[in-house]
């Protein structure tokens, strides 16, 4: 009888293995109904068991059965047992339990996705041994890639195999999603092939031994989060990542780790493999000694939320060449590398051979001798600095002694540059002040109470300058007169539309400067701005409606000097109405006595050419008058003995001309009396004092004049305008003259 019962039991057991129970199938996945009241189902094994589940399986969050929607809440025990051809599995957030041995003998399962979910996922084990080591749920699976979007709950003891991913030696990539709060002890213990781990922003803690023996872990990403991340250790005086040869780190949050003597639990202390570090936006502090001894560290980026970097944070970082402070509004306090009570200290980056720096933060630091003066003091390898748009000040001595520094870009929000900032920056050739609306105050290199001090860039050999700001500074000789004083190699200067004023002495003795364009935004060019600019040959004052106030070079009761006295300007574009002090003590009008000026073009915003403006410019050959000029003052071209080409551009309003010499008792001299004009284009009606005392008319007896074109818009030619122009044999009248004054063309061969 007992033998019959045993045979019956064996037959039933065998049948149960071969033909698992299920209620329905949907899209190749088999289900049993867990609860008809709650409308829940569980994934179960297939009738074919070892062959049904293969390739990629995506478990849906819900299925339709008998016309009703059931939530998938469970993967049953042994559901995928023996499915050796199952390669990829995705488990939805609706699943809250995975039964024991669910993946027994799934020897092909490489890719696992546990989708994001708020509820924990309870997982069983592969086998339980009460007297020896058990096996975790994925023991038989050669997992390579894992997305963990759920909090896992499991028996973590020795008899259950510690953790679901314990000693997964093929696992190379892990991403922990935002649904996870905790990575338990030994979470990835012994994952010898693990190369990259991403930890979600809501993970609050990582337990002890979580990455023990992860000997290939090179990349770690800790995403931004609202709370610090508490991390454990590897035990025996070792930090959590002591076994990991990390090379790349993204740290989006502050880390908290157990306090210790000698920083042994600091996770990155003396991490000699680390090469690249980025601190994310949720981190607030880089602690003391944080990256001390990371001798292979090459590049470091500090997030905008960091407000403090502690002492010795980069001590021994002897390969650190790139440093980036991301743009941020707040002030960032920096510690030191070594404070000394009796000798010169060491600044924070003393050990770092930084070559490239992006500074997006305003820095607060000690300028004391005992703290090494400034964080980048004496950075011998620093070549390039860019200061971002959130920085408002550059403190004293910031780049003192950076002998290799060649280019500096200063953001448009900087309002203050302290003293000695670029002292001994002997390789500095290019400076860019980015566009900014507010004036920028700049300090000096040396104050000298008994002589000329040293300006901010006195130790540099500038070649190129972009000036996007109005600069203010102490103009006294005791402070070096101006930041660019005696920059004798400065050959290229660009002034932007944000500049309102060129202050006193600004380009004093910039003897290599050859051309300059001054935008229409500039309203003042102060005294001695171009003193000693002996190579300046081309000057363009761009169009602007507001008048431009010009200073002078030298005030002297005997004989002053005009603003452009020292220049060698040959070509001038004048797009502005000018205001200036007219008198011999100021040297006269700003463009008078310009001995090399050959060509002048007056733009269409100019209304007035003042008295004496181009007086005594002996080589001036060509002059173009803009269409909006309404008045040309007296003596404007007196002494211009080479002016042969004159153009009055087409304009609607008449143009009033002054005179050259007024003789109250005899024949005066008209405006162009001194000028041997040969070619004339007349696009305007001219008005002038038509009396003997002023020389009758502007071209009266102009015997050099050979060619005249009268534009289409001109209908009136005044009295005696071309009287006695005996060489005028080429006269073109493009329009119709309705009024021709008395003797207008008297003696002109072309008229005859």
Which stretches of residues belong to each language-model region?
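N-terminal secretory signal peptides that target proteins for export/translocation
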Residues: 1-2
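Sec-dependent N-terminal signal peptides
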Residues: 5-13
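Boundary at the C-terminal end of the N-terminal hydrophobic targeting segment
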Residues: 16-23
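GGW-centered surface loops in extracellular recognition modules
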Residues: 23-49
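Structural signature of tandem-repeat unit edges
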Residues: 36-38, 52-74, 84-97, 107-127, ...
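Consensus positions within tandem repeat domains that build extended binding/scaffold surfaces
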Residues: 77-79, 99-102, 135-137, 163-164, ...
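Well-ordered, non-membrane alpha-helical segments in soluble/globular domains
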Residues: 129-132, 234-235, 341-342, 449-451, ...
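Extracellular beta-sheet repeat scaffolds used for adhesion and glycan interaction
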Residues: 259-263, 371, 479, 585-586
